[in-house]
């Protein structure tokens, strides 16, 4: 028997017991010839003591950190002065026998050391020994268990869908898998189980879910991975309200399993409201700074830049904040909004009851009226911008408010703000392809399909938590004629629609129920619960921002024989552009 107890289990009630523990040597101290070893496993730590007269003393002299050992001994109460408030802090084990299970070389770092993320990812098995990383994966497990408990209780079936499927791009690039048996043909790893879960609804499985692995070949950010986990959910015979109400309860239940209480009722705003007020379709409302339309305050101005914008149908918008402002800071913020296509940034502040601004000479009257109408107080700063494209203006100011919040508001770690964003545009214009594309995906039910393309709204909904989209879903199209019309609107010919989605169009002919669903980004849900800066901290073996695995070296080259078997030739992949066939 390797152990009778874990290293986080023993307490004062176990004093006098003979026990066997196994784990990693976390730390070693030598006090007056007595060896104090902190033994660690994923459950906790236990102090074990090797006295000079112990038969195990000689071997204890040779043990190093991160060795894996087994000890046998007797549980003893610690002296009062050495007790701690940890789980095993009242006891220690007096060692009678030590068995070395595995030696450890000097590691590149010890658990808990502050080292670069690249090094952590290269030696991820060492990194995961850290108590914080250990906690992250335990919390992830608890949230996954809670999700399954809730869905099982509400009659959902967990059903797996294929990983090797047909390439039907949904916005990002597919990861392609060559077929050895079907020369020249490829599978695609699924970006989501979207079409299969709809086919399950057609099959009569009215409540489905799975923890789906999804794959998207896209540029990565802190909250993106090329492979990720989503909780995929679909229901038949539901309207949008049914999905929203049940999924609110679902998310509350999952977060409550790790001690987080979410609001009893999630607010709901439209996409248009989100963009107008927060400059984002995933608004973070924890710090105010709502965007205000200030155009009317400048309609009589002679200030050329502002006047030209207004005369060309543009807008002036801004928000109130309480950050320290100076010409240097303002210049940095102006450079930032220029990255989003704005020409510049105006600002003024109220200081000792007076307006202070570099443009006070030209716009002081407008600033005074804004100050009065919005009841500004000393220290308030108003940041403003003007542009003829209102959407671009909203987006730039939305990004600016997020930057300011991140840099200046330290209390964002407190509390959780949850809401739904609804009434999304069904389509968006793709300038590169010169056509409309589906904003979510082309299987979403449109509200007013006969309207102008830019006016069509979707039965789509996103769940937002602390400014992060944790879930997105929609009511689906269950009528083949409507589905064909949507394909036509986004520029697919009948032939292209049949080639890409013929199996779906065929299925919709044979009695498809009204259905809808949602998918939750599970990695992101866990990351928010733990307030980590990156979802990499809640994934056991993540990829880097360049999509590589530091641990295994993936992606890697393969043998020429493997490529020949797949009838694949590679060109221009060596350094210097040398051809490799």
From Swiss-Prot:
Pfam families: GAD, tRNA-synt_2, tRNA_anti-codon
GO CC, alphabetical: cytoplasm
PROSITE patterns in alphabetical order: AA_TRNA_LIGASE_II (PS50862)
GO biological process, one term: aspartyl-tRNA aminoacylation
Entries under InterPro entries matching the protein: Aa-tRNA-synt_II, aa-tRNA-synth_II, aa-tRNA-synth_II/BPL/LPL, Asp-tRNA-ligase_1, Asp-tRNA-ligase_1_N, Asp/Asn-tRNA-synth_IIb, AspRS_core, GAD-like_sf
Coiled coil feature spans: none
Predominant subcellular localization, coarse grouping: cytoplasm
Annotated binding of ATP, by residue: 216-218, 225, 469, 521-524
Positions of L-aspartate binding: 170, 216, 440, 476
Protein's cellular compartments: Cytoplasm
Annotated stretches, region: Aspartate: 194-197
The organism's place on the tree of life at top rank: Bacteria
Record's catalysed reaction(s): tRNA(Asp) + L-aspartate + ATP = L-aspartyl-tRNA(Asp) + AMP + diphosphate
EC number(s) from the headed UniProt entry: 6.1.1.12
Keywords (A to Z) from UniProt: Aminoacyl-tRNA synthetase, ATP-binding, Cytoplasm, Ligase, Nucleotide-binding, Protein biosynthesis
One example GO MF annotation: aspartate-tRNA ligase activity
Function text: Catalyzes the attachment of L-aspartate to tRNA(Asp) in a two-step reaction: L-aspartate is first activated by ATP to form Asp-AMP and then transferred to the acceptor end of tRNA(Asp).
Assembly: Homodimer.
Family listed: Belongs to the class-II aminoacyl-tRNA synthetase family. Type 1 subfamily.
Identification of the protein by name: Aspartate--tRNA ligase
Organism: Thermosipho africanus (strain TCF52B)
């Amino acid at each position: 028997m390797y152990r009778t107890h874990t290293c986080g289990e023993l307490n004062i009630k176990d004093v006098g017991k003979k026990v066997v523990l196994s784990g990693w040597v976390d730390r070693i101290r030598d006090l007056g010839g007595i060896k104090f070893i902190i033994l660690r496993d994923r459950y906790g730590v236990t102090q074990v003591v090797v006295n000079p007269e112990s038969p195990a003393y000689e071997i204890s002299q040779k043990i190093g950190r991160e060795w894996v050992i087994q000890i046998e001994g007797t549980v003893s109460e610690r002296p009062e002065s050495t007790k701690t408030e940890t789980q095993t802090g009242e006891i220690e084990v007096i060692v009678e026998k030590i068995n070395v299970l595995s030696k450890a070389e000097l590691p590149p770092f010890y658990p808990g050391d502050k080292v670069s993320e690249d090094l952590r990812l290269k030696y991820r098995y060492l990194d995961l020994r850290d108590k914080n990383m250990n906690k992250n994966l335990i919390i992830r497990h608890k949230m996954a268990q809670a999700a399954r408990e809730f869905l099982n209780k509400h009659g959902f079936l967990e059903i797996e869908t294929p990983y090797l499927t047909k390439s039907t791009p949904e916005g990002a690039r597919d990861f392609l898998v060559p077929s050895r048996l079907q020369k020249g043909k490829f599978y695609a790893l699924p970006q989501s189980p979207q079409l299969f879960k709809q086919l399950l609804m057609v099959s009569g499985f009215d409540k489905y879910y799975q923890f789906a692995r999804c794959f998207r070949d896209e540029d990565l950010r802190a909250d993106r991975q090329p492979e990720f986990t989503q909780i995929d959910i679909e229901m038949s015979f539901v309207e949008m309200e049914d999905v929203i109400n049940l999924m609110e309860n679902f998310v509350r239940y999952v977060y409550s399993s790790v001690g987080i209480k979410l609001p009893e009722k999630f607010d709901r705003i439209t996409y248009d409201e989100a963009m107008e007020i927060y400059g984002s379709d995933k608004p973070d409302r924890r710090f105010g700074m709502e965007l205000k339309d200030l155009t009317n305050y400048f309609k009589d101005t002679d200030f050329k830049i502002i006047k030209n914008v207004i005369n060309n149908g543009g807008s002036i918008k801004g928000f109130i904040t309480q950050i320290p402002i100076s010409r240097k800071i303002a210049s940095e913020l102006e450079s930032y909004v220029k990255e989003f296509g704005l020409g510049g940034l105006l600002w003024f502040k109220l200081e000792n009851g007076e307006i202070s601004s570099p443009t006070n000479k030209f716009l002081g009257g407008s600033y005074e009226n804004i100050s009065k109408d919005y009841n500004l107080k000393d220290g308030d700063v108003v940041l403003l911008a003007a542009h003829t494209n209102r959407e671009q203006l909203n987006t730039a100011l939305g990004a600016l408010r997020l930057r300011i919040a991140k840099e200046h508001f330290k209390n964002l770690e407190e509390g959780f703000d949850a809401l739904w964003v609804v009434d999304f545009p069904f389509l968006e214009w793709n300038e590169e392809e010169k056509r409309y594309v589906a904003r979510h995906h082309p299987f979403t039910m449109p509200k007013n399909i006969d309207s102008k393309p830019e006016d069509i709204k979707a039965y789509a909904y996103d769940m937002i938590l602390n400014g992060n989209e944790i879930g997105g879903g929609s009511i689906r199209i269950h009528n083949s004629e409507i589905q064909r019309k949507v394909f036509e609107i986004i520029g697919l010919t009948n032939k292209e629609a049949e080639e890409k989605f013929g199996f779906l169009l065929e299925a919709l002919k044979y009695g498809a129920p009204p259905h809808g669903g949602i998918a939750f980004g599970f990695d992101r849900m866990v990351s928010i619960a733990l307030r980590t800066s990156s979802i990499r901290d809640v994934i056991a073996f993540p990829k880097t921002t360049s999509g590589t695995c530091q641990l295994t070296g993936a992606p890697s080259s393969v043998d020429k024989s493997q490529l020949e078997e797949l009838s694949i030739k590679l060109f221009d992949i060596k350094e210097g552009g040398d051809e490799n066939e």
